[in-house]
């Protein structure tokens, strides 16, 4: 369940999320080890963020998150691998600060403007979690209109950790890869997407991106820690007034990594 509301002439923004599920994954190359691993997991997430516009287009705010993720192998070998690398899941509760810059012309389907978001989450046992560690994120996006309703954009995403257990490491933020299959202390990705409008409601998008895991034994200077992907798909405008869209995309990563995505909203 996702909720987003603005009030006070958009001086206040409140975002909340609650979700959970049972997840099955079959990895042909788990964490780049060449070993196939089958996992099963239970997860729930509660998160909330409040932003206050201090001066257009700047926002300051706070956020909190409560996650519970339990992962276990579907067979003895998978379970032993997960135990050895410490990927068994845990409860984590944290809070942090947010600084955001938002000059986009629309929240759902921007066609121009710039978006920047820097935030941290301090996970602490004193808040009810099982580990003390920190996560820092920086996201930048810029939109350029062209043609008749088409939009070109780029996006830079970063996630850094400090003292995080393996279950709290960063995963690839790149279409075409399964979340959690490749992990590192830190992650940075850069993506470019062109959304080509074909009519009042229909259009298609093409995209490409690169990501890197680094920190510890991983480095962006090592080719094995750099990941590429590309793809494309169709989009349909469900509500023209609100610029709500549905998308169907295919992304191809390295090796056997690929994915088909159907969602409400944009993938980037």
Residue positions per predicted region:
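Transmembrane beta-barrel strands of outer-membrane/channel proteins
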Residues: 16-30, 62-68, 114-122, 138, ...
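C-terminal outer-membrane beta-barrel translocator/porin domains of Gram-negative envelope proteins
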Residues: 84-88, 92-217
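Flexible, surface-exposed loop regions and adjacent strand-edge segments
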Residues: 31-37, 76-83, 135-136, 159-160, ...
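Residues on the lipid-exposed face of transmembrane beta-strands in outer-membrane beta-barrel proteins
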Residues: 1-5, 48-52, 97-101, 138-142, ...
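Outer-membrane beta-barrel strand-turn architecture
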Residues: 6-11, 52-56, 103-105, 110, ...
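Gram-negative/organellar outer-membrane beta-barrel architecture
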Residues: 1-91, 184, 243-247, 251-268
């Amino acid at each position: 369940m996702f909720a987003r509301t603005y009030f006070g002439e958009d001086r206040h923004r409140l975002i909340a999320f609650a979700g959970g599920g049972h997840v099955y994954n079959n990895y042909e190359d788990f964490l780049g080890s060449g070993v196939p691993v089958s996992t099963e997991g239970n997860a729930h997430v509660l998160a909330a963020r409040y932003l206050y516009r201090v001066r257009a287009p700047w926002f300051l705010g706070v956020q909190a998150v409560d996650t519970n993720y339990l992962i276990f192998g579907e067979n003895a070998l998978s379970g032993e691998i997960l135990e050895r690398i410490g990927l068994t899941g845990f409860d984590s509760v944290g809070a942090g600060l947010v600084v955001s810059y938002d000059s986009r012309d629309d929240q759902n389907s921007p066609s121009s403007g710039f978006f920047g978001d820097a935030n941290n989450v301090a996970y602490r046992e004193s808040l009810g979690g099982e580990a003390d560690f920190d996560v820092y994120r920086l996201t930048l996006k810029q939109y350029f209109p062209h043609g008749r309703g088409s939009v070109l954009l780029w996006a830079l995403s970063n996630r850094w950790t400090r003292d995080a257990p393996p279950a709290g490491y960063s995963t690839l933020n790149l279409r075409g890869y399964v979340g959690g299959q490749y992990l590192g202390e830190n992650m940075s990705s850069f993506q470019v997407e062109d959304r080509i409008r074909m009519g009042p409601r229909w259009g298609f998008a093409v995209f490409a991106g690169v990501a890197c895991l680094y920190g510890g034994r991983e480095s962006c200077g090592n080719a094995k820690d750099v990941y590429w992907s590309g793809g494309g798909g169709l989009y349909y405008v469900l509500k023209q007034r609100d610029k709500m869209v549905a998308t169907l995309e295919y992304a191809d990563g390295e090796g056997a990594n690929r994915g088909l995505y159907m969602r409400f909203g944009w993938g980037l």
